[in-house]
Swiss-Prot record:
Keywords: DNA damage, DNA recombination, DNA repair, Metal-binding, Zinc, Zinc-finger. CDD domains: TOPRIM_recR. May play a role in DNA repair. It seems to be involved in an RecBC-independent recombinational process of DNA repair. It may act with RecF and RecO. The gene is recR. Belongs to the RecR family. Transmembrane segments: none annotated. This is Recombination protein RecR. It holds the Pfam family RecR_C. Signal peptide: none annotated. PROSITE patterns: RECR (PS01300), TOPRIM (PS50880). The keyword DNA repair applies.
Length: 198
């Protein structure tokens, strides 16, 4: 089947979204073609403004449109505990559980030799400084239950072992190979409540 060039380009771009295959991209493209022009302009401007305005928090690495994010307000959070995640989206997944009230630290990924991502590519030194400066008592490691997530968790445990802090990890009720982004709130809430020493 031969689509017009501009439609083909739109389908190709939509396929870049995670979990969107060719058929879904086709459906989205045809749906967008039926949108009124003002909705398309609004979508385009919203995407551009979001990309322009949203940045990483200077403290924790989460997403914000201010210098420091909501999650770093020590007057609103338990400042003795810090939850370490790989990506900002993980912070929002955990927040949806309403089970955690501490601070966060986003590493910016996990260790991955296949992608040439070593410890120097992650925000580990910043984490260590924050633990000292804030006199953190507990670090909760909330990384995906994958080989890379497990390797990163073990690395963090070794790096932080000298500090006099409790290190815990989300309970292993999470399915192996799962991504926090796809775990339902109930499962994530139980995993947070049942976290264990690590």
């Amino acid at each position: 089947m031969r689509y017009p060039e501009h439609l083909l380009k739109l389908i190709h771009i939509l396929k870049k979204f995670p979990g969107v295959g060719h058929k879904s991209a086709e459906r989205f493209a045809f749906h967008l073609l039926n949108w009124p022009m003002e909705h398309l302009i609004e979508l385009s401007e919203t995407v551009k403004n979001t990309k322009d305005k949203i940045k990483q928090c200077l403290n924790c690495g989460c997403l914000t449109d201010e210098a420091a994010c909501y999650f770093c307000d020590i007057n609103q959070r338990d400042s003795q505990i810090i939850c370490v995640t790989a990506f900002p989206r993980d912070v929002f997944s955990i927040e949806e559980t309403h089970e955690y009230r501490g601070l966060y630290h986003v590493l910016g990924g996990v260790l991955s030799p296949l992608e040439n991502r070593g410890p120097e590519h992650l925000s580990i030194s910043r984490l260590k400084h924050r633990i000292q400066d804030l006199q953190i008592k507990e670090v909760v490691i909330a990384l995906d239950s994958t080989l890379e997530g497990d390797a990163t968790a073990l690395f963090l445990k070794q790096e932080l072992a000298a500090d006099d802090i409790q290190i815990s990890r989300l309970a292993f009720g999470l399915p192996m190979g799962s991504s926090l982004d796809y775990v339902d709130g109930g499962t994530l809430a139980r995993a947070l409540a049942g976290r264990s020493r690590f």
